[in-house]
Regions:
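Key DNA-contact positions within bacterial/archaeal DNA-binding proteins
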Residues: 53
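Conserved segment of winged-helix/HTH DNA-binding domains
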Residues: 14-15, 19, 75-117
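Residues within the DNA-recognition helix of helix-turn-helix
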Residues: 58
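Glycine-centered, phosphate/nucleic-acid-interacting loop/turn motifs that mediate DNA/RNA or nucleotide
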Residues: 66-67
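N-terminal leader segment of winged-helix/HTH proteins
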Residues: 1-21
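Short capping segments at the starts of secondary-structure elements
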Residues: 25, 36-43
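Pre-recognition alpha-helix immediately N-terminal to the DNA-recognition helix
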Residues: 28-32
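A short acidic, leucine-rich amphipathic alpha-helix
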Residues: 43-49, 62
Length: 118
């Protein structure tokens, strides 16, 4: 069930729908955690303090947009399959000229927070 997917170092995001997906703190954190190492829904839910259902919802949206993929599947005791997710790229950079007006504030605030941390 493992997918043969090419991993990119950097992905420039220009598609408005993908940009809207990235304008969400939870999805941003999921991608950040997955860029460190592949993780399961359970591991992500424990790290982020969210339910597995919430994580599953966000992973589904990211997978539909080809921003994450299943890197491997492992069977646990009792036959439960654990899917390990990885991002399609180590870093997603949003093209500032393509950001829809309704989410521009989110990215501006995110950039300000990033610069304050430098």
């Amino acid at each position: 069930m493992e997918e043969n997917v090419t991993y990119k170092a950097v992905c420039i995001v220009e598609d408005e729908e993908k940009i809207r997906l990235l304008a969400d703190f939870t999805r941003e954190e999921i991608l950040r955690l997955l860029s460190v190492k592949p993780m399961t829904e359970t591991q992500l839910s424990q790290k982020l303090g969210l339910t597995k259902a919430a994580i599953g919802y966000h992973l589904h949206l990211l997978a539909e947009a080809d921003m994450v993929h299943i890197e491997k599947v492992e069977a646990e005791k009792h036959g439960i399959l654990q899917k390990y997710y990885s991002p399609a790229a180590a870093l997603f950079i949003v093209d500032p000229d393509k950001i829809p007006k309704d989410v521009k504030t989110y990215f501006t605030q995110t950039q300000i927070q990033f610069l304050r941390g430098l």
